[in-house]
Amino acid sequence: MDAYSSFPAEFEAVRPIYNVLVATAGMMWLINYIVTVRQIFRDRVRAIPLVSLCCNIAWEFTVVLVYRRPYLLFEIFCAMWLLVNMVIVYGSVKVSMEKQRSSSLVHKHLPLIVPLAILGCISGYYALAKTIGTPKTIHGGGTFASFVMTVDCLCQLLQRGSTHGASWTMWLTRVLGSYAAIVGEFLKAGFWPQQWGWYDNALMRWCTGMAVTMDILYACIFWYMGQAEEAAKGRKA
C-alpha cells in the first residue's frame, strides 16, 4: 500500500468528503489567481508579493512536472494554477518595472531576478524531496507555501497602508482554498494514519494556527483601511 492507492476502508468511507475538499481548494485558488490577474492590470500594482509568488510557483512546478502525484483532479488543478500563475508573474514584473524603485539595481534586473528566485525555490523543493520524501514535500511543502503567502500578503498590506491591489474576493478565495486543502490533509492523517499520520505534527498545526491568526488579522486591517479610504473620499467630495 502506497500513499496514493489501495485506500484503507476507514479512508474510503470519507473519501467523497476529501474529493469535495480537493475540488473546493482547486476552484477557489483558480478563481483567486484569475481575480489576481484582473487586479494587477486594473490597479497597475503587484497583487501578490514576489517572494511568496516565487515559492508558490516553484511548488506548483514541482508537483506538475517533477513529482507528479497520481491523482488526476489534483494534477489538473495544479496545471491550471501554473498556467495562470505565469500570467501573474508577467503582470507583476511588468507593473513593478513601471514604477521607479528605491533600488535601481533590483528595478532594472527584475525580469532576471524573478526566474532565478523561482529556480532557487524549485531546487529547494527538490532537495527537500531527497531528504524527507516526495509526499511530505508535496503536501507539507504546500502547506508551508500557503503559510508564506498568508504572512507575505499581510506584510504587503501593512507596508502599502492601503487596499490598493487587493480585494475581499482575493482574500476570501485564498482563505477558502487554503483551508479546504489543509482540512483535507488532516482528514487523511486521521483516517489513513499508516501513510499520512506524519502530517498531524506540531509544525503543521503551528503553520495552520498561525495562518488562521494572520488571515483574521488581515481581514480586520483590510476592513479598517477600507473604511478609512471611504471616509477620505467622502471628505474630498
From Swiss-Prot:
Catalytic activity, as annotated: (S)-(2E,6E,10E)-epoxygeranylgeranyl-triacetate lactone = sartorypyrone F; (S)-(2E,6E,10E)-epoxygeranylgeranyl-triacetate lactone = sartorypyrone D
Transmembrane segments: 17-37, 47-67, 71-91, 109-129, 138-158, 167-187, 206-226
Disulfide cross-links: none
EC number(s) reported in the record: 4.2.3.-
Family annotation (InterPro entries): PaxB-like (IPR039020)
Associated pathway: Secondary metabolite biosynthesis; terpenoid biosynthesis
GO CC list: membrane
Subcellular location as annotated: Membrane
Phenotype seen when the gene is deleted: Accumulates 2 uncyclized prenylated polyketides, sartorypyrone E and poxygeranylgeranyl-triacetate lactone.
Membrane topology: Multi-pass membrane protein
Enzyme class label: lyase
Record key words, sorted: Lyase, Membrane, Transmembrane, Transmembrane helix
Any Pfam family the entry gives: Pyr4-TMTC
Gene Ontology terms, MF aspect: lyase activity
Purpose: Terpene cyclase; part of the gene cluster that mediates the biosynthesis of meroterpenoids called sartorypyrones. Within the pathway, spyD catalyzes the cyclization of epoxygeranylgeranyl-triacetate lactone. SpyD exhibits promiscuous activity, resulting in the formation of bicyclic sartorypyrone F and monocyclic sartorypyrone D. The biosynthesis of sartorypyrones begins with the production of triacetic acid lactone (TAL) by the NR-PKS spyA using one molecule of acetyl-CoA and two molecules of malonyl-CoA.
Stated family: Belongs to the paxB family.
The name this protein goes by in its record: Terpene cyclase spyD
